[in-house]
From Swiss-Prot:
Enzyme class: lyase
Superkingdom of origin: Bacteria
Catalysis: reaction(s): (1S,2R)-1-C-(indol-3-yl)glycerol 3-phosphate + L-serine = D-glyceraldehyde 3-phosphate + L-tryptophan + H2O
UniProt keyword Lyase, yes or no: yes
Pfam short name (any one): Trp_syntA
Organism, scientific name: Yersinia pestis
Keyword field contains Amino-acid biosynthesis: yes
Keywords, ordered alphabetically: Amino-acid biosynthesis, Aromatic amino acid biosynthesis, Lyase, Tryptophan biosynthesis
GO biological process: L-tryptophan biosynthetic process
GO-annotated molecular function: tryptophan synthase activity
Protein EC: 4.2.1.20
PANTHER family noted in UniProt: TRYPTOPHAN SYNTHASE ALPHA CHAIN, CHLOROPLASTIC (PTHR43406:SF1), TRYPTOPHAN SYNTHASE, ALPHA CHAIN (PTHR43406)
Coiled coil residues, start to end: none
Protein name (record): Tryptophan synthase alpha chain
Length: 268
């Protein structure tokens, strides 16, 4: 959890926002996945948001579903994902690593065991996409027991009670949802609602990162202008992977260019 606090402190000192890429672990293969993640970090990613491939991802659009299918085709399992995570942490000791995943994978070997594994490999936060806040108590308790930040989604229509709960129980960062629906770069994120960011700040919530539909530098600038601490981009990055599966060198060149441009937009 401290890695997020350190990151936001360093970025504030430099007057920068955070740019956080999302990819599926093991897509398109475990070895290439590690190359991709190294490339994202070298190009300026401030933190990582990583998915563990799941067969029935309710919140994901086709781009991220296809990434899971590629990982499955390469034989990726949750166990292999944890090996990849351990390797990332060994190489990159300070970058915050977040998981974005589904409850079934957490339940599989018991909630406590899951968070224990996360702690062992150096994961900082876990967001469970299909667990609403009101059902999150056992997950947050296990997360905090193992020093993992429980991350909550703040939807665009959040009422005051939910904002207070998220502020009170969330750690690390707050996932500010651009809009309802599924992930996808073609579904442009609406600008974050300033009043949500203001309220979250008033209630001392963890810094807000805006996600869903963030695919160009202007959207990163707009997120920061509305008071968010940064932006998360997933589908746009996964699309670059998808289009270049057969040409890995070109893939890494395009990923570097994309992340460099998105990160540049976080500098005022």
């Amino acid at each position: 959890m401290e890695r997020y606090q350190q990151l936001f402190k360093q970025l504030a000192a430099k007057k920068e926002g955070a740019f956080v890429p999302f990819v599926q672990l093991g897509d398109p293969s475990p070895a290439m996945s590690l190359n991709i993640i190294d490339t994202l970090i070298a190009a300026g990613a401030d933190a990582l948001e990583l998915g563990i491939p799941f067969s029935d991802p309710l919140a994901d659009g086709p781009t991220i579903q296809n990434a899971a299918l590629r990982a499955f085709a390469a034989g990726v399992t949750p166990g292999i994902c944890f090996e990849i995570l351990a390797e990332i942490r060994q190489k990159h000791p300070t970058i915050p690593i977040g998981l974005l995943m589904y409850a079934n994978l957490v339940f599989h070997n018991g909630i406590d065991h899951f968070y224990q594994r996360c702690a062992e490999v150096g994961v900082d936060s876990v967001l469970i996409a299909d667990v609403p806040f009101e059902e999150s108590a056992p997950f947050r308790a296990a997360a905090l027991r193992h020093g993992i930040a429980p991350i909550f989604i703040c939807p665009p229509n959040a009422d005051d009670d939910l904002l207070r709960e998220i502020a009170s129980h969330g750690r690390g960062y707050t996932y500010l949802l651009s809009r309802a629906g599924v992930t996808g770069a073609e579904n442009h994120g609406q600008l974050p609602l300033n009043h949500l960011v203001d309220k979250l700040r008033e209630y001392n919530a963890a810094p807000a990162l805006q996600g869903f539909g963030i695919s160009e530098p202007a959207q990163v600038k707009a997120s920061l202008a509305a008071g968010a601490a940064g932006a998360i981009s997933g589908s746009a990055i996964v699309k670059i992977i998808e289009k270049n599966v057969a040409q890995p060198v070109e893939m890494l060149v395009q990923l570097t260019r994309f992340v460099t441009e998105m990160k540049a937009a976080t500098r005022s």
